[in-house]
Design a protein with these regions (language model features):
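C-terminal substrate-binding subdomain of Rossmann-fold SDR/epimerase-dehydratase oxidoreductases
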Residues: 1-133
């Protein structure tokens, strides 16, 4: 495996790496289906100008280093990684406000971090050169 670079380890977080919200692609797809169903006639009250904006996320932030460690643990592997310089413009913490989709559509993600890590690893093993290669 190539070397994974974690950009920055000097942020004001518990382990020095950025914090982000991670979500499984299956949860995203299910959220998209719920939003697309809004465009049915009976849901006009939730639409403004045939437009609806919803953020999706788990409402839980994980540091980049926590993700790497979770990936290693979930899959029983050791990743080859190093810390690089910060990227210009990276926010210390980036978490979406998902209250609208939780409230209006009763959508919540169902797949946790450990399963996300396992599914990602299995996908990469099945498609080492990418999905369409």
């Amino acid at each position: 495996m190539k070397e994974l670079v974690i950009f920055g380890n000097d942020y004001p977080t518990k382990d020095g790496t950025c914090i982000r919200d991670y979500i499984h692609v299956t949860d995203i797809a299910q959220g998209h289906i719920l939003v697309l169903n809004l465009f049915k006639k009976e849901n006009e009250d939730l639409l403004k100008d045939n437009c609806a904006i919803y953020n999706m996320g788990s409402n839980k932030g994980y540091s980049v280093k926590e993700i790497v460690e979770s990936y290693e643990k979930a899959n029983g592997i050791k990743l080859n990684y190093r810390f690089g310089n910060r990227r210009k413009g990276d926010a210390v913490i980036a978490l979406p406000d998902c209250s609208k989709i939780y409230k209006e559509l009763k959508w919540i993600p169902k797949i946790g971090l450990e399963q996300m890590c396992k599914d990602s690893y299995n996908f990469i093993k099945m498609h080492p050169n990418g999905l369409f290669d």
